[in-house]
């Protein structure tokens, strides 16, 4: 059986709602993403609860601090048994290299370490506001290249950026793509650069982060398995 390409974002207000969803799916259907809101509310115990259920967990906390602090946070993530953890590439080479070094003692059991380049909600005007008068993709490519040079496993990127990043950085460099929608004609939230699951995989994405289209569906497992079938 092929590994799940879908990472479901558990963006629920209450832990009980998240666990109710989790009880409807299996680790062979998807992986799970825990973001800042749920982690801040429910902490490491919630992550460990999901790991004990057999799920691969992507801890999406986007660490961005001085190298020593980020290294310690990444190590703590590995201790929880997560499958993937991320940092902000804009923290720089030294920070990313420190994070990578912190995982060396874990060997094959180390989580994948990826970096966030440009948030998918950001457009050129947003970059200009913070002093970067360049197109978003130019900054994405710059940070993704730096991430690879620092020895990380991949980056988060929009699906529109995936094909160029794959050709520039190679097949082994993992691309994790949010902004996935089952119907791109409906723009209902804060992801500006969106694409369908099939198109994103064709573009070069390795893993797809999908939230509301699955978690808010009347029958989440049916939707999830339909997506998986389309990607088979």
Curated annotation (Swiss-Prot):
Keywords: Decarboxylase, Lyase, Pyrimidine biosynthesis. Pfam families: OMPdecase. The keyword Lyase applies. The active site is at residue 62. Its EC number is 4.1.1.23. Signal peptide: none annotated. GO terms for biological process: 'de novo' pyrimidine nucleobase biosynthetic process; 'de novo' UMP biosynthetic process. It catalyses: orotidine 5'-phosphate + H(+) = UMP + CO2. Catalyzes the decarboxylation of orotidine 5'-monophosphate (OMP) to uridine 5'-monophosphate (UMP). Homodimer. PANTHER family: OROTIDINE 5'-PHOSPHATE DECARBOXYLASE. This is Orotidine 5'-phosphate decarboxylase. It comes from Tolumonas auensis (strain DSM 9187 / NBRC 110442 / TA 4).
């Amino acid at each position: 059986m092929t590994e799940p390409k879908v990472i479901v974002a558990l963006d629920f207000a209450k832990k009980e709602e998240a666990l109710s969803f989790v009880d409807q799916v299996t680790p062979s259907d998807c992986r799970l993403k825990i973001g800042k809101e749920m982690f801040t509310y429910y902490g490491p115990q919630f992550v460990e609860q999901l790991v004990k259920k057999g799920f691969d967990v992507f801890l999406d906390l986007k660490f961005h601090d001085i190298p020593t602090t980020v290294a310690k946070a990444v190590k703590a993530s590995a201790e929880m048994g997560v499958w993937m953890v991320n940092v902000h590439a804009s923290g720089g080479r030294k920070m990313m290299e420190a994070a990578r070094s912190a995982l060396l003692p874990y060997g094959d059991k180390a989580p994948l370490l990826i970096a966030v380049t440009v948030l998918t909600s950001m457009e050129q005007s947003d970059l200009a506001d913070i002093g970067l008068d360049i197109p978003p993709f130019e900054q994405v490519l710059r940070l993704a290249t730096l991430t690879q040079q620092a020895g990380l496993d991949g980056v988060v990127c929009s699906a529109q950026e995936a094909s160029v990043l794959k050709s520039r950085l190679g097949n082994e460099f993992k691309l994790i793509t949010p902004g996935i929608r089952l119907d791109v004609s409906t723009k209902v939230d804060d992801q500006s650069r969106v694409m369908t699951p099939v198109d994103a995989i064709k573009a070069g994405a390795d893993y797809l982060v999908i939230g509301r289209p699955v978690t808010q569906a009347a029958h989440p497992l049916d939707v999830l398995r339909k997506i998986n079938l389309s990607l088979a």
